[in-house]
Amino acid sequence: MAAPNLITPLRDICVKVVAANFEGCPTFGPLPDKYVKRIIDILPLDLPLELVGSLIADEDYWRRRSQARWKNCEVAAHGYSWKQLFFERNLMEFLEQYDPAVTDLSSLKRLLTYSRRFVQTVHIRQLPSHLDLQILFECMVNTPSSLALSYNLKEVGMDYDRSLFGMKLSDCRALAKALEHTETLTHLDLSNNSLDDDKVRMLASGLVENLSITHLNLSHNKIADRGVRALAKLLDGHSVISLLELHDNQIHTEGAESLARAFKSNQCLLSVNLRLNRMGDEGCKAVVESVRGSPTLQRLNISANAAGPGTAAAVVALLRLNNTLTELDVSCNQFGEDACGNVRRALEQNGSVRLMDVRMTGINPDDEMAIAENLRARQERVDKARVLGK
């Protein structure tokens, strides 16, 4: 029977001493990896970020630190990295709570500067300070790659004031200037920001000089025809935007026709979402006809736009002539039973579409069931081919 170890080994004492004094002496020296790991496992979780950010890459440390601060941590939304999660959420909270009357601007700039190496996505749910976003891009050189920004206000209660919500024209002007120079931002989400035509035109002045943004989300705003005309100019032959989301706005026929003219020369768009607008039959028809010969477009959504038989005829031609489109949503329109029958027959001749929504278009149950069975059989063939590696 082995004698009990009554004396703590010197190496264990050293590990504890190094961990306890890490803030004053932030180095691991030439220690073997197994001792470095033991030190990190007992490091305090309140060490300054500027200190541990560059020295500690161990994911277990950042997991413990994240879970100690927040109850719900979805690491998948942060590149499956606990370190990235911590820095992104820490920056998000600081920006959302930033008050220039209380916190010095230099503190914000310092946080942005030392966080930039570990941050890919900036997601801001409220920005009551209406901070000049040029500061963010100037400090975070070469980052972020994704910006989701919402000018809402949480927990307002009885102090509710409609003017506190949404982007101001000055916010759009500052962001437009920043967008002219950023070269790493690929995803811009400005949904639900009360953007109207004047604000979108201001943003477009910066977007026209931008060659990095590939995913643009301006949904759930108040963009009408004048604003859409400005956006259409961004979608020329030199555009790099591949995902365009304009659903739930106020786009009418004229705006739809402006987009249609731009779509004809565009060689980059992969997905366009225009649902919940007011394009009408003529506007939807123009959009569908414009993408008939597109060599790139894979997803198109024009649901809930008061489209009629004219659009249905354009959809029939699209299905017969286009072989790149894989998803099409025309639900909640007014095609009529006869037009929907033509759509069903055209789909049978099409070999590329795998998802198609024709609900609430006046289609009879037999045609709707036939379309569903057709698409289900196609998907089964695709799944089988994927399993077999074909």
Curated annotation (Swiss-Prot):
LRR repeats lie at residues 182-205, 210-233, 238-261. Disruption phenotype: Defects in DRC5 give the sup-pf4 phenotype characterized by disruption of the assembly of several other N-DRC subunits. The keyword Iron does not apply. Keywords: Cell projection, Cilium, Cytoplasm, Cytoskeleton, Flagellum, Leucine-rich repeat, Repeat. It holds the Pfam family LRR_6. One of its GO terms (cellular component) is motile cilium. It comes from the Eukaryota. It is found in: Cell projection, Cilium, Flagellum; Cytoplasm, Cytoskeleton, Flagellum axoneme. InterPro entries: DRC5, Leu-rich_rpt, LRR_dom_sf. The keyword Cytoplasm applies. Component of the nexin-dynein regulatory complex (N-DRC). Interacts with DRC1, DRC2, DRC3, DRC4, DRC7 and DRC11. Belongs to the DRC5 family. Component of the nexin-dynein regulatory complex (N-DRC) a key regulator of ciliary/flagellar motility which maintains the alignment and integrity of the distal axoneme and regulates microtubule sliding in motile axonemes. May play a role in the assembly of N-DRC. This is Dynein regulatory complex subunit 5. It comes from Chlamydomonas reinhardtii (Chlamydomonas smithii). The gene is DRC5.
